[in-house]
Curated annotation (Swiss-Prot):
Belongs to the UPF0225 family. Gene3D superfamilies: 3.10.450.50. Transmembrane segments: none annotated. Pfam families: SEC-C, YchJ_M-like. SUPFAM superfamilies: NTF2-like (SSF54427), Sec-C motif (SSF103642). This is UPF0225 protein PputGB1_4297. InterPro entries: NTF2-like_dom_sf, SEC_C_motif, UPF0225, YchJ-like_M. PANTHER family: ADENYLATE CYCLASE-ASSOCIATED CAP C-TERMINAL DOMAIN-CONTAINING PROTEIN, UPF0225 PROTEIN SCO1677. Coiled coil: none annotated.
Length: 158
């Protein structure tokens, strides 16, 4: 049992917060998944970061770059500005946040409005840096069974 405070900024212990998501419990919503992904970067849990990215994008992730960024950064904090659940089937959500870190080039902060989709009881991050190989009338890569244009297309800027 970990007695360390969770890096996500909740103030809770890691095991009572993001730690159980890292151990396999599905995050209950997009904000919890986003917080657990930040904690995974802090803790160097690249397998978790890959597993919580939309499955159709996982093969194209640069695991080595993710691991290097995680290891070479001192993580300074996470601020969640807003979380929106849009409903529908499948359920989509957005989380707006700012992450701060320090590396050999100095202090940095990154503000992002991340998109998420829920499928089969699990939330997934839709990575804007990894293209989705789907035409508008193709089945959606999130495996919802809907056409891409009726599902995730508007959430990935395609």
């Amino acid at each position: 049992m970990s007695v360390s405070v969770c890096p996500c900024g909740s103030g809770n212990l890691l095991d009572a917060c993001c730690g159980h998501y890292h151990a396999g419990t599905p995050a209950p919503d997009a904000q919890a998944l986003m917080r657990s992904r930040y904690s995974a970067y802090v803790l160097g849990l690249v397998d978790y970061l890959v597993a919580t990215t939309l499955p159709a994008q996982q093969a194209d992730l640069d695991r080595a770059a993710m691991a290097a960024w995680s290891a070479q950064s001192t993580w300074l904090g996470l601020e969640v500005e807003s979380a929106e659940v849009l409903g529908g089937q499948p359920e989509h959500g957005f989380v707006t946040f700012t992450a701060r870190w320090h590396d050999q080039d100095g202090d940095h902060q990154h503000r992002e409005r991340s998109a998420f989709v829920q499928h089969a009881g699990r939330w997934y991050f839709i990575d804007p840096t990894v293209g989705l190989k789907a035409g508008r009338n193709d089945p959606c890569p999130c495996a919802s069974g809907q056409k891409f244009k009726k599902c995730c297309a508007s959430y990935v800027g395609s």
